[in-house]
């Protein structure tokens, strides 16, 4: 894990060494102060040479000025190093998340992933700056201070250093406990973020059902668990801090008592005694730094472990080494003995065989859960078939690059996702870099002109979080405009009009028919009236493809489609 962590320093070697050696130089200057005080008391005071005293004072001031400059470098440039590494890691993680399939997101909470991208990486950034530097300098300062102490009085130095093994043992002990505590804390932060994200994202549903009290109770459970975990980690920190404080102050008292005895015996001068006490304080500073590391390291370690677990999650759907870019596909689709299950225990689709001709409109109907949407989701490789193969124009979709395959397929869903931003940005998402002329052409084709002209800022009107300022029909038209701009060879309409009123549905259907012209179109619908003009209707059940044919042929066959049609239109007449 350390090798993986330090690999992120490679692009910033110069910055790392600037920060590292500045911190080392600053630490060495700290050691010089007690020696200069010793020189003042034992040499300059008895000699009463004001010229030498002033010269030494100026030299000490220069040391302090240089130390201040080094402190600035360590604080600013050192944090720049940490921020750069944090930024690189966040970019790598975000890029990696773009490669993961729908299956991964089906099994992971959005709030947890958000926490990994934000909180975890902030802790890692702090460790990247302070970690190696602080640990090395702490050890170096302790050894340097001990060396000077030995030079002044080796007996007192050895007596003072007896306490160090206890301090080191405590550091290792509390570091282990803190790592465990912060691993749990990071998980709780993820759950906490997921709860808040769910509530805020679904606030309209919460208020519509009047379930605010229920949501408060659920939030209180997560909030309390987060509180308890955080308190337990701070309890460990408090124990570590208080015990370390007691030990270091005991050492100070010990040095004062023993040092006084050595002075009275005449084996230690006054200047050496004061220098020794000051060196004891220099010795404590890295111990305090080690305590800070004990608090910081576990957060960073837990965050980095979580980061690496996510980075090591291999995309289950990715380009094969021999995959090639495709363009200008006609849209001849063939499913050959295709099976698929969302888990290893149950298949949604079993041994599906289906051929679709280029330019053909094929509608999929059947009971919920039979696999209609799943069948279509396998085509752009949102999910991977567990058995069999799917080809387009005779080429296996596994032999096409994902970007070029998905560039040839457009999906219009019932639940349209829109980004926070303007109408223009959401339409242009269909083809990044599209010209103004192309965007307006798509607006006209989707019958969005009236909406755009009625908006206060036209195409530059902000539509709110996920398009909250637009109606369902307006969202659908915007989605269709986006698809006109993309201009795919193959179109998937996933229950695109099932939640709209009759008038809006008719307008959307007209736009969809225009969009479907000349394209291979796969339609998933519950409302059979919308697909009676399809070239072919495929009835999908839990047993696979039950029957297929044109609307009238299936009605006359008296099979499942006929019964579904009779049940649906019988209900409509009854109503």
Curated annotation (Swiss-Prot):
Main location: membrane
Amino-acid positions noted as binding ATP in the UniProt annotation, renumbered to this chain: 366-373
Annotated transmembrane regions: 16-36, 50-70, 132-152, 154-174, 243-263, 264-284
Keyword field: ATP-binding, Cell membrane, Membrane, Nucleotide-binding, Transmembrane, Transmembrane helix, Transport
One Gene Ontology cellular component: plasma membrane
Residue stretches making up the ABC transmembrane type-1 domain: 16-299
Gene3D superfamilies registered for this protein in UniProt: ABC transporter type 1, transmembrane domain, P-loop containing nucleotide triphosphate hydrolases
Entry membrane topology: Multi-pass membrane protein
GO biological process: transmembrane transport
Keyword Transmembrane helix: yes
An example molecular function term from Gene Ontology annotations: ATP hydrolysis activity
Subcellular location: Cell membrane; Membrane raft
Domain ABC transporter positions: 333-567
Similarity-based family: Belongs to the ABC transporter superfamily.
PANTHER family reported for this sequence: ATP-BINDING CASSETTE SUB-FAMILY B MEMBER 10, MITOCHONDRIAL, ATP-DEPENDENT PERMEASE MDL1, MITOCHONDRIAL
Name of the protein in its database record: Uncharacterized ABC transporter ATP-binding protein YwjA
Annotated source species: Bacillus subtilis (strain 168)
Source species taxonomy: Bacteria, Bacillati, Bacillota, Bacilli, Bacillales
